[in-house]
């Protein structure tokens, strides 16, 4: 039976038992920051186990079934080496939130396994918690499992969470019952006589039934008290791939139909045949590529922290095993389409996101293989210096790992092939000495010898400001002068470390004049750091905020500084900002002055002084002037001059910017006929000619504050994308309304007029409905207490507005306290007389809700809410009146 068929049989079976089938939730938990990935079938349903109402599709469902994709990396070192561990798996589950309990869960599990999957009842074993007589008796008396195939175990094996009674945590917990399948003596060891015995694979756990019935309370650690929960829940999990291996009669899940095609493709790529349990690398690659594709398809990205590092680690581990098979070029991305083909029918996001996933994997592979190549060269040099039979020192093996990300197992493998050993104990000692923070990231802070501010002052005194090369180049060779972390100076920084890098010269533009700081890469032999942004001190020393991704960055290192090519888009937007400023002055008048700006690769934002919103024709005129300027392809030039001279020439200064004695003036020629010319003091980056901007489109115009307006615009390809998107939306709207685009506005006006007329009709009908309901009584007879007339009316089918109108009408008819109910909604209205006697609507409604259920509030004469029991409300209201 194919895996997809098993999955469908399970979900259909429990649908037949009154369960709602839900699609798999994302691997990326939406509202649970405690989880990196969804790691169990019940994880996305946690709120409903804790008491939240399980509302799906507008109704309450107490029974749910899912096939949930999960990702766990706690036992990653065992993946590929055993038949029980994998990272990405699918968990079949049926859940009850305060509905059925042990009897149904056990009977249905047995029914599904024996009648629908046709498993031999004689090969099924079960275990229960040692004190759970109820579950034991259900298995023995109702199901008919012989006592010799029912095992009783303690809290470590058959209680959830494991060991909770003695060790905690406090909270919902309960016994569990596990179902095992006996694969026969061929899969076991002599000491394996039943579930949880021996070390073989004979007895395979296929289903765990958790009976959440207690609230564990007490000291941690220490013996806890188990108090019965008011709501008893069922949480079950069946391992889809384990069941598939049994039904497909293969030795383990690696040979099932969703795994084995990947293993076969790895064997074909590498020329190394798969030989079962000994082919660890084939297994690791198949497992890890599935996990990486699934995580990326759900929105994860590679990074050095959190879930991004988990999938990076999985990819690199798979690449290392590929290297052991002789796969020295990127190959994992070529397996991604196969993963999507095998799983995409049930997880369509894998097919939908495949192009992006392939690209991400390819780029990540290329980066890591570059690192491996550098490590291989270093290892070759080290081994060449050893005598036959000697051992590579552990500190050298660790340096390979530290600097090049070169894995120890690969070092051992290559050294062994050439007749050398590796001091693995020395490797571990070196790692401990470096005080590795975790497997997720490592940071090195050697010889913290000076405060960062002191270092910057000394650098400026010795070398002056950073030399900026970015006006003419996006790449440059530079020397690392300092590394700063917080207020401390470092001599070196390893993978995962975030530092401020000071270079002797740089092509990176430092944030200023509205233009964002450049981002990109610093590269050196065996290493790379990603620059996230660039700023500079008042003395002109550039600080590159960077995170080391590969290798170790050291003071004195020669690096290649590479600005991200999107800087060209920033240049387009910066020059366009100057053109926009001049065009606004030409259209609106000389009162327009810059009041702020943002220049980024994907957009520009320009704040300017102007007292009122721009008229549509003014915006159109501004946009047209800028685009004519662009099409004319005028030159953009700049030169340095004394500040006073620049001001005399009419160069405009930027808002909030500080200038020195000598300034840079950027000039853009314009058409004398249009009265256009731009001349501004600016240290930013610009295009050489206006034609390079391509196009200019205004996206929005709005107020920032009194007398200050803001325009957001796009240029170049972003402008084309924006225009195309707008046209596509217009076309789609026209098609939806079944008119030509030219007639769209007329059609919309007609529809809006019709809508207003219908709304008037609806309001009229609601008013008549209220009057009819009140005229019919609606249970709204007036009663009196303490001089106040009160009434409770039930009027089905009204919305909140109509309810308020009904309450107003009742007060107008003489009621001092009117409570109107419709469905789950309620409105309470007081007359001036009732208020004069000290009643307040909000307080009265809350008091009523305490006695009749529900919730709500208000103030003065009006309160509203929902959930009141009509009978209880009618009985309770007079008792709350004075």
UniProtKB/Swiss-Prot annotation:
Pfam families: DHHA1, tRNA-synt_2c, tRNA_SAD. GO terms for biological process: alanyl-tRNA aminoacylation. This is Alanine--tRNA ligase. Its EC number is 6.1.1.7. PROSITE patterns: AA_TRNA_LIGASE_II_ALA (PS50860). The lineage of its organism: Bacteria, Thermotogati, Deinococcota, Deinococci, Thermales. SMART domains: tRNA_SAD. It is an enzyme of class 6 (ligase). Binds 1 zinc ion per subunit. GO terms for cellular component: cytosol. Transmembrane segments: none annotated. InterPro entries: aa-tRNA-synth_II/BPL/LPL (IPR045864), Ala-tRNA-lgiase_IIc (IPR002318), Ala-tRNA-ligase_IIc_anticod-bd (IPR018162), Ala-tRNA-synth_IIc_core (IPR018165), Ala-tRNA-synth_IIc_N (IPR018164), Ala-tRNA_ligase (IPR050058), Ala_tRNA_ligase_euk/bac (IPR023033), DHHA1_dom (IPR003156). Zn(2+) binds at residues 574, 578, 682, 686.
């Amino acid at each position: 039976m194919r895996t997809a068929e098993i999955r469908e049989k399970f979900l259909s079976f429990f649908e037949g038992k009154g369960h709602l089938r839900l699609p798999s939730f994302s691997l990326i938990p939406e509202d649970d920051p405690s989880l990196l990935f969804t790691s169990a079938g019940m994880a996305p349903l946690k709120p409903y186990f804790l008491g939240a109402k399980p509302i799906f599709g507008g109704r309450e469902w107490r029974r749910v079934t899912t096939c949930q994709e999960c990702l766990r990396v706690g036992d990653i070192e065992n993946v590929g080496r055993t038949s029980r561990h994998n990272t990405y798996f699918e968990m079949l589950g049926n859940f009850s939130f305060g509905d059925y309990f042990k009897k149904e869960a056990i009977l249905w599990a047995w029914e599904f396994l024996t009648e629908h999957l046709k498993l031999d009842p004689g090969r099924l074993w079960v275990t229960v918690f040692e004190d759970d007589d109820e579950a034991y008796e259900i298995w023995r008396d109702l199901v008919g499992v012989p006592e010799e195939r029912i095992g009783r175990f303690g809290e470590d094996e058959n209680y959830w969470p494991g060991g909770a009674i003695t060790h905690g945590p406090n909270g919902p917990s309960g016994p569990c019952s596990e179902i095992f399948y006996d694969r026969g003596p061929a899969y076991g060891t002599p000491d394996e006589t039943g579930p949880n015995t021996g070390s073989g694979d004979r007895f395979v756990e296929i289903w765990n039934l958790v009976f959440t019935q207690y609230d564990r309370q007490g000291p941690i650690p220490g013996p806890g008290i188990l108090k019965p929960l008011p709501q008893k829940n069922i949480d079950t999990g069946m391992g889809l791939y384990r069941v598939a291996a049994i039904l497909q009669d293969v030795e383990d899940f690696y040979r099932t139909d969703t795994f084995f095609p990947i293993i076969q493709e790895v064997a074909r790529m590498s020329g190394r045949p798969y030989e079962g349990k000994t082919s660890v690398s084939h297994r690791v690659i198949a497992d890890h590529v599935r996990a990486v594709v699934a995580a990326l398809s759900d929105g994860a990205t590679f990074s050095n922290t959190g879930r991004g590092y988990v999938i990076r680690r999985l990819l690199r581990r798979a690449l290392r095993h590929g290297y052991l098979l002789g796969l020295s070029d990127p190959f994992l991305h070529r397996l991604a389409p196969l993963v999507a083909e095998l799983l995409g029918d049930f997880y369509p996001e894998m097919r939908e996101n495949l192009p992006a996933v392939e690209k991400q994997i390819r780029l990540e592979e290329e980066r890591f293989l570059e690192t491996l190549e550098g490590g291989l060269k270093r290892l070759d040099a080290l081994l060449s210096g050893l005598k036959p039979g000697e051992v590579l020192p552990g500190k050298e093996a660790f340096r390979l790992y530290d600097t090049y990300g070169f894995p120890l197992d690969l070092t051992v493998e290559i050294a062994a092939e050439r007749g050398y050993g590796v001091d693995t104990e020395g490797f571990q000692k070196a790692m401990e000495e470096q005080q590795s923070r975790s497997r997720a990231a490592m940071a090195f802070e050697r010889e913290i010898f000076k405060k960062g501010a002191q270092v910057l002052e000394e650098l400026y005194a010795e070398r002056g400001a950073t030399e900026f090369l970015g006006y003419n180049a996006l790449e440059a060779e530079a020397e690392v002068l300092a590394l700063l972390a917080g207020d401390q100076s470092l001599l070196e920084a390893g993978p995962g470390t975030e530092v401020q890098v000071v270079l002797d010269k740089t092509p990176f533009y430092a944030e200023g004049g509205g233009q964002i700081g450049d981002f990109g890469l610093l590269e050196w032999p065996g290493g790379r750091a990603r620059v996230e942004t660039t700023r500079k001190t008042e003395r002109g020393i550039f600080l590159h905020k960077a995170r080391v991704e590969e290798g170790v960055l050291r003071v004195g290192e020669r690096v290649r500084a590479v600005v991200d090519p999107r800087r060209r888009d920033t240049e387009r937007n910066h020059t366009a900002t100057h053109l926009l400023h001049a065009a606004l002055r030409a259209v609106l008048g000389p009162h327009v002055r810059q009041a702020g700006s943002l220049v980024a690769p994907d957009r520009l934002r320009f704040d300017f002084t102007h007292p009122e919103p721009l008229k549509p024709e003014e915006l159109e005129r501004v946009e047209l002037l800028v685009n004519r300027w662009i099409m004319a392809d005028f030159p953009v030039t700049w030169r340095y001059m004394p500040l006073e001279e620049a001001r005399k020439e009419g160069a405009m200064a930027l808002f909030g910017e500080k200038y020195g004695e000598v300034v840079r003036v950027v000039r853009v020629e314009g058409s004398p006929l249009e009265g256009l010319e731009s001349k501004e003091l600016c240290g930013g980056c610009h295009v050489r000619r206006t034609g390079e901007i391509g196009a200019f489109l205004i996206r929005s115009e709005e107020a920032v504050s009194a007398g200050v307006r803001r325009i957001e615009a796009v240029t170049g390809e972003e402008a084309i994308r924006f225009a195309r998107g707008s046209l596509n939306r217009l076309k789609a709207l026209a098609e939806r309304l079944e008119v030509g685009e030219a007639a769209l506005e007329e059609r919309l006006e007609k529809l809006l007029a019709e809508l207003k007329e219908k709304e008037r009709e609806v309001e009229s009908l609601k008013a008549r409905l209220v009057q009819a309901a009140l005229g019919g009584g609606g249970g709204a007879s007036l009663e009196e207490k303490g001089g106040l007339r009160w009434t409770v009316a039930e009027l089905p089918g009204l919305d909140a507005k109509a309810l308020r109108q009904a309450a107003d009408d009742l007060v107008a008819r003489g009621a001092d306290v009117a409570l109107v109910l419709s469905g789950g909604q309620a409105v309470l209205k007081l007359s001036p007389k009732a208020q004069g006697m000290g009643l307040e609507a909000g307080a009265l409604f809350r008091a009523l809700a305490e006695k009749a259920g529900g919730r709500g509030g208000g103030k003065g004469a009006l309160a509203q809410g929902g959930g009141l029991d009509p009978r209880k409300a009618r009985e309770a209201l007079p008792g709350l009146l004075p």
